[in-house]
Amino acid sequence: MSREQLSLEIIEAGRFLYGRGWSPATSSNYSARLSASEALLTVSGKHKGQLGPDDVLATDLAGNSLEPGKKPSAETLLHTQLYSCRPQVGAVLHTHSVNATVLSRLTTADHLVFEDYELQKAFSGVVTHESQVVVPIFDNDQDIARLAAKVQPWLDTHPECAGYLIRGHGLYTWGAKMSDALRQIEAFEFLFECELKMRAVMNR
């Protein structure tokens, strides 16, 4: 896929995610693999519902901008580490929904477990509701290199992992294609909303 096509996918993802309320204002960041050694990412500080072609830039997998004058998101390393350690990943999405933010703050454990939901089959590799989808939760950290170092061991030991939460911050998920990552965002958001409603009903 060409750079122009990948950029358009990122722009369209931004409009969709903003429209669903999962990427308010200038929050969130999105990316797509450009080559084996490069990625396209959203430029820092841009409104995700109003992205244009100039709001996307190329970086290397160390997170360095390859386009003078354009600054990538501060969280670029969390994208590029996925492209580095998982060759099959073609797109990464990071969102800041209310459900993801609140649920990650309410959960004192370092992970969430979802089971017996039919929608679990929306995740790549999951073929039955009779399984578990485990979502790790990492404490927020302004030092992104340090945060990435905490995430890496989980990625290394859990190849089935489809996404993770940063406490009080948001969700990261990914897929072979942008459409896969978007599908998983929707599935995660459904599960997060179900979990919050279950907790409210059960007063826990």
Swiss-Prot record:
Its cofactor is Zn(2+). Gene3D superfamilies: Class II aldolase/adducin N-terminal domain. Binds 1 zinc ion per subunit. Its EC number is 4.2.1.109. Pathway: Amino-acid biosynthesis; L-methionine biosynthesis via salvage pathway; L-methionine from S-methyl-5-thio-alpha-D-ribose 1-phosphate: step 2/6. Keywords: Amino-acid biosynthesis, Lyase, Metal-binding, Methionine biosynthesis, Zinc. GO terms for biological process: L-methionine salvage from methylthioadenosine; monosaccharide metabolic process. The keyword Manganese does not apply. It holds the Pfam family Aldolase_II. InterPro entries: Aldolase_II/adducin_N, Aldolase_II/adducin_N_sf, MethylthioRu-1-P_deHdtase_MtnB. It catalyses: 5-(methylsulfanyl)-D-ribulose 1-phosphate = 5-methylsulfanyl-2,3-dioxopentyl phosphate + H2O. It comes from the Bacteria. The keyword Lyase applies. One of its GO terms (molecular function) is methylthioribulose 1-phosphate dehydratase activity. It is an enzyme of class 4 (lyase). GO terms for cellular component: cytoplasm. Catalyzes the dehydration of methylthioribulose-1-phosphate (MTRu-1-P) into 2,3-diketo-5-methylthiopentyl-1-phosphate (DK-MTP-1-P). HAMAP family: Salvage_MtnB. Belongs to the aldolase class II family. MtnB subfamily. This is Methylthioribulose-1-phosphate dehydratase. It comes from Pseudomonas syringae pv. syringae (strain B728a). The gene is mtnB.
